[in-house]
From Swiss-Prot:
Any GO CC annotation of this UniProt entry: ribosome
Keyword rRNA-binding listed: yes
Top-level lineage group: Eukaryota
HAMAP family: Ribosomal_uS8_B
Function: One of the primary rRNA binding proteins, it binds directly to 16S rRNA central domain where it helps coordinate assembly of the platform of the 30S subunit.
GO-annotated biological processes: translation
Cellular compartment(s): Plastid, Chloroplast
Name of the protein: Small ribosomal subunit protein uS8c
Quaternary structure annotation from Swiss-Prot or TrEMBL: Part of the 30S ribosomal subunit.
Record-stated family: Belongs to the universal ribosomal protein uS8 family.
SUPFAM superfamilies for this protein: Ribosomal protein S8
Subcellular location, principal: plastid
Keywords for the protein's UniProt record, in alphabetical order: Chloroplast, Plastid, Ribonucleoprotein, Ribosomal protein, RNA-binding, rRNA-binding
């Protein structure tokens, strides 16, 4: 059984990205589905779909003839052993705004830009660049 489903999701994406694999299958949770929606709307992945009740399939994006990955880095920030919370003023900017931070707020899971616009802080789930 997987203890940290978000870390497992990010690791599967990171490994598939390194091997230039287009589709990634993973166990589906409500948080994983919301992260997949954010990744798609921000342009980090091509698409996602629910394959069955318990699985989620992501289609990764690559660019150019050499199939360079769009995602160059994923990092889990808040872990089960060490939670990281930030106030609305301390919401991180990833690479000066070129990347995305995913924040779990009282209004749901959102990007760093949305959290700043709504003036919300919360738990920093991961950083994507």
């Amino acid at each position: 059984m997987i203890q940290d489903t978000i870390a497992d999701m990010l690791t599967r994406i990171r490994n598939a990205n390194a091997m230039r694999i287009y589709t990634v299958c993973m166990p589906m949770t409500s948080v994983a589905r919301e992260i997949a929606v954010i990744l798609e709307t921000e342009g980090w992945i091509d698409s996602w779909k629910e394959a069955s009740v318990n699985s989620l399939i992501l289609r990764l994006k690559y660019r150019g003839a050499k199939q360079q990955p769009i995602l160059t880095g994923l990092r889990r920030v808040s872990r089960s052993g060490c939670r990281v919370y930030v106030s609305a003023k301390e919401v991180p900017k990833v690479l000066g705004g070129m990347g995305t931070a995913i924040i779990s707020t009282s209004k749901g899971i959102m990007t760093d830009r949305e959290a700043r616009n709504h003036r919300l802080g919360g738990e920093v789930i991961c950083l994507i660049w």
